């Protein structure tokens, strides 16, 4: 019995030493999204252009605080009106490696993001009707808009060679800024979010390098 107790205490101490020996900070990665530029070029013939990069730190083999930022330009329409705008966006959040399996980069990831975007835009030929007045088409130039939303993300990353890795993310997006200010007309497109909807989705396929 004493031998069994000694063996248990030794194993526990060894496990504790192993856990304590994991460094907190384990490098920084930079990622470039390849999916959005290709998808939008094919889908909209270049009328929507969306570019983004991401930076994340690796902590304790499992946690990945992440900053994503980018720039988008869009020419699109709805109900006969036309939107032309450009602006930047940023997302801040953290990913968690689902499987705790040591120092490997290969893993499934889940995470959350808080995102915001600023843009300037023009809306032309917009259908407007007020009370009993007949509908008319109006133009709104030099509009400015701030939007924010939350995201739930899931995906995977795969180690390639000497710091190079690749992976993908699927995103579910929930728009928080749903109301317009007095005298403001909502944009049809939001950088980083996509077409303006209360719920939206997105996909990223990236290649990155960890330093």
Q: For each of these PLM feature ranges, what is it?
A:
Residues 10-58, 68, 208-211:
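Short glycine/proline- and aromatic-enriched beta-strand/turn motifs that initiate or cap beta-hairpins
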């Amino acid at each position: 019995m004493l031998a069994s107790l000694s063996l248990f205490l030794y194993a526990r101490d060894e496990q504790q030493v192993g856990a304590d020996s994991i460094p907190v900070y384990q490098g920084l990665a930079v990622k470039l999204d390849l999916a959005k530029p290709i998808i939008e070029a094919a889908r909209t013939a270049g009328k929507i252009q969306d570019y983004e990069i991401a930076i994340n730190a690796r902590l304790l083999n499992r946690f990945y605080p992440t900053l994503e930022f980018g720039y988008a330009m869009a020419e699109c329409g709805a109900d006969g009106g036309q939107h032309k705008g450009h602006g930047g966006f940023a997302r801040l959040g953290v990913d968690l490696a689902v499987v705790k399996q040591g120092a490997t980069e290969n893993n499934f990831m889940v995470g959350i993001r808080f995102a915001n975007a600023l843009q300037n835009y023009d809306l032309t030929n917009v259908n407007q009707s007020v009370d009993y007045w007949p509908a008319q088409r109006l133009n709104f130039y030099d509009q400015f808009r701030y939007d924010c939303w939350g995201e739930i993300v899931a995906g995977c990353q795969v180690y390639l060679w000497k710091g190079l890795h690749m992976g993908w993310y699927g995103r579910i997006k929930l728009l928080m800024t749903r109301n317009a200010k007095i005298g403001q007309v909502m944009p049809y497109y939001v950088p980083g979010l996509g077409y303006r909807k209360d719920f939206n989705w997105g996909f990223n396929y990236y290649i990155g390098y960890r330093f």
